[in-house]
Amino acid sequence: MTRKSRRLWLVGACLLGLGTATALVLNAFSSNIVFFMAPSQVRAHPPAADRTIRLGGMVVAGSVRRQTQGDTPIALFDVTDGQAAVTVRYAGILPDLFREGQSVVAVGTVAPDGAFRASEVLAKHDETYMPKEVAEALRRSGKWDPRYGKAPDAASWNTMTVGDARHGEANRS
């Protein structure tokens, strides 16, 4: 084997190793990325059943239902962005700051029946905080325009009922 062919084999092996390492890193990143979606996006373009997403919006007033399955507490509630609502099923204890009419981010997957199976529920920490993703979803839905002030507070969402959220209408009296 000549010196030139040995060098060519070495360069080829290095490129093959670099390509393999790049493919492995990209595969690891793609399986660990969790995308944020608003309820209207989930309704319009449901993600694959095995795809983990973050669902963010406001908890619809009057939608929280509590059950038990054995010793495990089950919470069912609707999350809305003002245009659509998605029912969330969470097995576990909800955060202390979880309230109807407050912003929430749930991490989980969409079931074949369209319900969202949450593995984690994150509640806001005070009445003025709204997660960046939820505020962005409200802006995109037309429920809030940053040129006209801060995002709507929880009190303005407390008047939205389950029926209004499912039909995309906010009952603002």
Swiss-Prot record:
Heme binds at H125, Y129. It is a single-pass type II membrane protein. It comes from the Bacteria. SUPFAM superfamilies: Heme chaperone CcmE. Residues 1-7 are cytoplasmic. Residues 164-173 have a biased composition (Basic and acidic residues). InterPro entries: CcmE, CcmE-like_sf, NA-bd_OB-fold. GO terms for cellular component: plasma membrane. One of its GO terms (biological process) is cytochrome complex assembly. Keywords: Cell inner membrane, Cell membrane, Cytochrome c-type biogenesis, Heme, Iron, Membrane, Metal-binding, Signal-anchor, Transmembrane, Transmembrane helix. Residues 29-173 are periplasmic. The chain crosses the membrane at residues 8-28. Residues 148-173 are annotated as: Disordered. One of its GO terms (molecular function) is heme binding. It is found in: Cell inner membrane. Belongs to the CcmE/CycJ family. Heme chaperone required for the biogenesis of c-type cytochromes. Transiently binds heme delivered by CcmC and transfers the heme to apo-cytochromes in a process facilitated by CcmF and CcmH. Also required for indole-3-acetic acid (IAA) biosynthesis. This is Cytochrome c-type biogenesis protein CcmE.
